[in-house]
Amino acid sequence: MAIIGLSLAAALGGDAAVGAASMLAAFTVPEFNILAVLSFTVFSDDKSAGIEKLKGVVKKIAKNPLIIGIFAGMLALLLRELQQKLFGEVVFSLQRDLKFLYTSLGNLKSVTTPFALVVLGGQFTFAAVKDYRKEILGGVLFRIVLSPLIGIGAAIALSALTGIVSFGTDAYPGLIALFGSPVAVSSAIMASQMDGDEQLATQLVVWSSVCSIFTIFITACILMATGHLPM
């Protein structure tokens, strides 16, 4: 969601859709990572109990790079707002005052996901598909078929049948990004770090990425045909 999802939202709906998708990412990325850490901890072989296990969970959540990045970004935004209130303008801006560093970080950001996919591709083995075929089929179907069907379907139903929530065309690219994006590249890294099944996680990332090319296209076409996405 944080990387592929925002690019997908931009392609489907432009700047307005990116704004909505960014708001979704700000809440869902920390939530998903916290739930992932909890899941790995609950189903791990760690025999710790009580306070010790709770401390371990909190420590792993606090050390998660994506969660740290989200809260660091929020802190930077708060500091920017504080500067404007205190001085009437932004006194220091990374983009303005350290342009070389800002440009370098931007270039680095653009290669992170492709590089991670290349690394995962190097670890991918077709022989493992035979051992994990049921898990791969179930995981991929749930992630890129059932998840968007339930999530986006619920959004359409809420908008059409109730007056509680109304989703505009700017919201649906973000919802496609949230519910229809493939398994995150970082999940394989997290599985390795937390003694999970790294090979299965790698298989899910690769196969969901390949299959999502078709499911996202079909989803976008259906929503365009029904007027939920701009043509």
Predicted regions and their residues:
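Alpha-helical transmembrane segments of multi-pass small-molecule/ion transporters
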Residues: M1-M231
